[in-house]
Amino acid sequence: MPNRRRCKLSTAISTVATLAIASPCAYFLVYEPTASAKPAAKHYEFKQAASIADLPGEVLDAISQGLSQFGINLPPVPSLTGTDDPGNGLRTPGLTSPDLTNQELGTPVLTAPGTGLTPPVTGSPICTAPDLNLGGTCPSEVPITTPISLDPGTDGTYPILGDPSTLGGTSPISTSSGELVNDLLKVANQLGASQVMDLIKGVVMPAVMQGVQNGNVAGDLSGSVTPAAISLIPVT
């Protein structure tokens, strides 16, 4: 019995000693190949700016290098690259593009066509003031009336050109054509070209199409009612 106990004890001790020695060796044998397979850490080098004035250029270079990887190239910005001409964007456009200047200040003929003609026209011709001679100064002229199959207002005008709050209604126009053009130009200058196009597509065109459809429906209804009314007339 004592010998058997000694054998079991020695076997257990040898097993524990073997595991204690083999475990660290196995750990290092497994860990080293996996550690060498991992990519090495990248170290980024940052270039120090010479002064504060160089910071915009350094930032632009970093942004352009980052975007160039995606195929995006930034155009050069003169205001941040330190050009010798500081007033590059503050020049007067009339010196290089005369079309952008105000023609009313230097050319009074454009504001008063009647006084700038040779000989000057002091009266008010019919063609320059059509509102004062409506209804028959030109016998051969065809009067302009409400478009066919549209829903006009009470005075024969189309309501969508008046107040924007009454689009599609039947209220007549209370402003003249000059005031309407000025209002449209002011709205275009305030909103911008893209927003004006969106306004025309989203508000004006649907109102026009709705008026056309309402006019077509009214025409169809009048055509369908007329035969029934004629059929009620007794034939003698």
UniProtKB/Swiss-Prot annotation:
Residues 94-105 have a biased composition (Polar residues). Keywords: Signal. Residues 1-22 form the signal peptide. Residues 76-105 are annotated as: Disordered. It comes from the Bacteria. The keyword Signal applies. To M.tuberculosis ERP. This is 28 kDa antigen. It comes from Mycobacterium leprae (strain TN).
